[in-house]
Amino acid sequence: LKAIFNAVGRYCPSLAVSVSLLLTVAPSTAVAAATSYPLTLKNCGQEVTFKAAPTRTASIGQSTTEILYLLGLADKVVGTAVWIGPVIEGYEDVNAKVPRLADNDPSFESVVATKPDLVTAQFQWHVGPEGIVATPKQFAELSIPVYVSPADCAAKDNSAGGDGVRHKSFSMELIYQEISELSEIFDVQDRGEALIAKLKAREEAARGKIANADGKLSAVFWFSSAEMDIDPYVAGTNGAPGYILSALGIKNVVSTEEEWPTIGWETIAKADPKIVVIGKMDRRRFPADDWELKMKFLKSDPVTSLMPAVKADHIVVMDAQAMNPTIRTIEGIEVLADAVEKAGLAK
């Protein structure tokens, strides 16, 4: 089972096929209406107006940048920042041509220096009322419109900074809204509709793989830890992992509505999750960002090493981007469904 579960996080033939289908977004048979400019949208509580399709976009956040790539808009991206892992498969060459303003948080000056006519952001933590890069007002003073992913502001309070508090469970509909609105802003609605249709089809296929598992399994998602020997950041019910588990009929042993609460391993062990999902990322802000250190900890710690899921090697390595509210969340559903199916846990 170890080979089955760990390999899924790095390579999965069925997943590779699914991703390859996504990489080229063909126009749908029905022709969507063209955008009528000026276009005004309400985004994260603010009205944003576009006089024409943007030609120079500074994109702060990996997911939103990847959406722009998938919509065939890479040539409109003049700078990007905040990446925690490799670009979506098939877009390595495209991404290499886009200037990286910063792997993590860019400065306001570096964003403005790209001379953007649009700034997109994945998180209000970066561009929002308390944004550490800037506030929308700062960009507005330079006549630069801002678009923030609806997944980070709908039914969510970011006023205290950090991960914020999500008052309603995340749904992929928020990502589909982002795709739809970005495609309207850039007047590529046909591409947006085709991309959404493919993502929905992939989710439906993944759900069908382990339909018999409904209510039989439980899991915990471990994103990272500030230090290896303190309580880990694990997924609550209202974030992307909650959506993944709900889609597959798997119980989350963490019942709090917080997105990423810290919970002790003793408490987690008592809940006895049948599967442990660990995040894989390039980011190294914390020691536990390294998935291999997570794996080593699970197998050597006096508490976690005795957990039945760990002893049975029911550990799934998953791209951390799938654990955030992103287009990769669909990939997370596929990875977990494939792991459960191949291990025979859905029977």
Ranges and model annotations:
Residues 108-115, 133, 263-272:
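Short helices/loops that flank or line small-molecule/ion binding pockets
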Residues 86, 126-134, 144-181, 214-240:
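Extracytoplasmic ligand-binding site segments that recognize negatively charged/polar headgroups
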Residues 63-67, 83-86, 118-119, 124-129, ...:
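Solvent-exposed loop/turn segments at secondary-structure junctions
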Residues 41-45, 98-109, 152, 257-265:
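Short helix-initiation/N-cap motifs at beta->coil->alpha
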